[in-house]
Amino acid sequence: MAKAKTERRLKDNEAQAIARTLRVSPQKLNLVAALIRGKKVDRALAELEFSRKRIAGTVKKTLESAIANAENNHDLDVDALVVAEAYVGKSITMKRFHARGRGRASRIEKPFAHLTIVVREVEEKGEAA
């Protein structure tokens, strides 16, 4: 029997947004998630704006949701936010069939993925007085 799943606790300076059941393979989604990991949110939004990947628009909406959660629910400063974590999970796989020659059929698998983005407020290191 498996252990009970424990939810990840957010710290006081963090906020998150989750997009579930996205119609893209986890491998392709992870390419876009790796693009924004560790970057400041304004830089990450710019990267997603000009990315040519199809799923980049959905990732951008999820990041904007995480920023809005940080501002409205957790009272964090938007200018000091960085993308602390952006991780991808595997979801369901739809099975479809494709008719082939001689009366045969082959299976087509259409994968789905989950995306979780955690933004964290950081203090500026060298502030000028």
From Swiss-Prot:
Sequence similarity: Belongs to the universal ribosomal protein uL22 family.
Paired cysteines (S-S): none
Organism annotation: Agrobacterium fabrum (strain C58 / ATCC 33970)
Gene name linked to the record: rplV
Gene Ontology cellular component list: cytosolic large ribosomal subunit
InterPro entries reported in the protein's UniProt record: Ribosomal_uL22, Ribosomal_uL22_bac/chlpt-type, Ribosomal_uL22_bac/org-type, Ribosomal_uL22_CS, Ribosomal_uL22_sf
Protein name: Large ribosomal subunit protein uL22
Known partners and oligomeric status: Part of the 50S ribosomal subunit.
Coiled-coil ranges (or none): none
Protein keywords: Ribonucleoprotein, Ribosomal protein, RNA-binding, rRNA-binding
GO molecular function: rRNA binding; structural constituent of ribosome
Function: This protein binds specifically to 23S rRNA; its binding is stimulated by other ribosomal proteins, e.g. L4, L17, and L20. It is important during the early stages of 50S assembly. It makes multiple contacts with different domains of the 23S rRNA in the assembled 50S subunit and ribosome. The globular domain of the protein is located near the polypeptide exit tunnel on the outside of the subunit, while an extended beta-hairpin is found that lines the wall of the exit tunnel in the center of the 70S ribosome.
GO biological process, one term: translation
Origin organism lineage: Bacteria, Pseudomonadati, Pseudomonadota, Alphaproteobacteria, Hyphomicrobiales
